[in-house]
């Protein structure tokens, strides 16, 4: 099956606002098949303008969530778990309005939550994530959307770091609208064998982030890209592979992703060179 190549607008800007809509046409002009729109604050986005730009370009669209301290399905306080679900509900409305079939990201917990905790607490938090994702999956299904759940590296979460942990989580959730999302940046840190990790996710895998070992241009660093391609071919993956990177010019997201310097001659160069590399890799 043909694999499409997409780009996340985080490459250029954060947050995505009414002023960011032109990035959709930019992605099309560069030759991408799909665009991923981060919804950091749903109210900041001109939903109609986005829908119009998507209609005009014909690009496939995905949506990624942003999960800060108050958007945490594992939190001890139920009000924060409910806040996370309320945010997902608002974001799912946008997904449906735009025709996005996937809402992707680490939606089980707050990014940056990493601690040594007793096994009993870890298990409680795991069960909260399972219950929360079941509820979120039901909400997503009502909008014709699938949640694609992403493991993060050990420096960004203490709950789900590997494909094996993700597969266990999906089995526990056991909801048809909750599937797998893998990111090469995190895999490069946590997986011993990229191809094997992809194969373990198997047909549950519906979304892939292409991000270099330093978050720079795909193909310029240490990620096992050949292993990724082998794994995707082995499972017959037919979804999109989406370039994800960040710019140090956007201080909030740069601080969250620890981006302290430029990672390419320009963000446009990162996108264009990454697109060429991925076209060759996944042809």
Question: What is the predicted function of each stretch?
Answer:
Residues 55-56, 79-179, 261, 265-269:
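Active-site acidic/histidine proton-transfer and metal-coordination neighborhood
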Residues 70-75, 111-116, 156, 189, ...:
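A short acidic, helix-capping loop that chelates divalent metal ions and anchors anionic groups
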Residues 21-41, 91, 97-99:
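Catalytic domains of carbohydrate-active enzymes, especially glycoside hydrolases
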Residues 43-53:
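Active-site-adjacent beta->alpha loops and helix N-cap segments on the catalytic face
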Residues 1-5, 31-34, 55-62, 97-102, ...:
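Short, well-ordered coil/turn segments that N-cap beta-strands
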Residues 1-10, 63-75, 107-117:
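N-terminal small/glycine-rich loop or linker at the start of catalytic domains
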Residues 11-13, 39-41, 67-69, 109-111, ...:
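Active-site-proximal loop/turn and secondary-structure-junction residues that shape catalytic pockets
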Residues 1-9, 13, 17-28, 160-182, ...:
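Histidine-acidic metal/acid-base catalytic patches
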